[in-house]
Amino acid sequence: MEKIFASSLFGVLNIARVCLLAAGVLTASACQSESKMLSAPVTGYNHTSAAINRFSVNGAGGPNLGAYQGGGSQVCCGVVPRYWVPGLKAIVEWEKDPDPYSYGKWPERPYSDAWNKRMAREKQGYSRHKAIVEIPQYDSPGDLKVHFLPCDQVRVTAAGTSPGYPGYPYNYPMEMEEPEVC
């Protein structure tokens, strides 16, 4: 009888210890400060007639963008501060195809050896760019949104709003003309 009492008492004490440990862990995790950085999807808006074959913002890749396209897809994930700080900047790198629809006019059969050789020559005309730009103030963070503008200009925002809505910093027309001289 003493063995049964001792083993059931031991079981109750173990359960009590586990409950106290769990309560302590939950209490400690509830007291942690909020994170200073948040993950943010990356999306892009191409306001030019060129294609943006690939781009990255602060090392996080974004979707490829056809001429005058964007906002339709996101790639995960970049990182943004929970709260905007003065001097916040983004490094944007991208590859641009100035004539994205030229292959449609080629006489070569698509993906043939001749077509692949021509595509290799075409890719030599792609240009690569890098810009460091300021991220304007935002009240609540959102996606990292990159706007590609004529003359190889870019703008980046992490605002919690979208193009066309009040408070969005870059409401450019989707189709912008490239000036003759930049």
PLM-predicted stretches and their roles:
Residues 2-19:
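Bacterial N-terminal signal peptides that target proteins for export
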Residues 22-25, 70-71, 145, 176:
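Processing junctions and N-termini across compartments
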Residues 26-30:
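C-terminal motif of bacterial Sec signal peptides marking the signal peptidase cleavage site
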Residues 32-39:
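Bacterial lipoprotein signal-peptidase II cleavage site
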Residues 33, 78-79, 153:
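Disulfide-rich extracellular modules and peptides
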Residues 42-50:
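Structural motif
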Residues 55-101:
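Tryptophan-paired
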Residues 96-182:
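Beta-strand-rich cores of mature extracytoplasmic or soluble domains
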